[in-house]
Amino acid sequence: AGRDAMIFPTMWSPFKIASFTYVFSGSSDEKFMRHCKEDPDSVSAGVQAIADTLEDWAEGFLDAGADGLYYSGQFSEPGRFSQKEWETLVMPSDLQILNRVHARKEKYNIVHICGEAEHNFTASPERYKKYPGDLFNWDVHRDHFTLEQGREYFGKPVLGGLDNHGILIHGSAEDIAGETRRIIGSFGKKGLMIGADCTVPADIDVNRLRAAVMAAREV
């Protein structure tokens, strides 16, 4: 990794990539979900094959000098799966990859808990308590799970606080700086990495992000 910044490649979960094989071949997420319910064993076999490949991919990232993974945990949106279904279908492949990183000395897992647009960007952070994450990130504005709650629940540092559908996009630089100061003032500096709740647009004005960075440095 570089001297000035740590490197965390993004990796989507095997389950999400399995869904992509449907969507990008002209099928749909709805059909994938139907197959998960009707024939979970076949879906699990396919997801396992993807997980085995991604596990090797993750190892390659680490060997090349990455400091860990920014891992996008998926499919915990309310209404997709029951807790039992999720633990059977989704969780094992997540843990396969995250445990591989966790076993490496001085390598770290950033666990991003992602909700998709068709589910109003909501997810279920409470399902990730047993994940070997070193830093946790979720949508505090839509999951109704605050940074303070996350710090206590996970017992780990947390990332986020800035609404990637709100102030980061529509606010002024002064608004963003003010919100950054408010978050840090409320939460404190310990165990917090200020950031967005989820992905920001690729064409975002970098000065918006800079406003948050500079405000955080000044607190």
Positions of the model-derived regions?
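Active-site loop segments of alpha/beta catalytic cores
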Residues: A1-V219
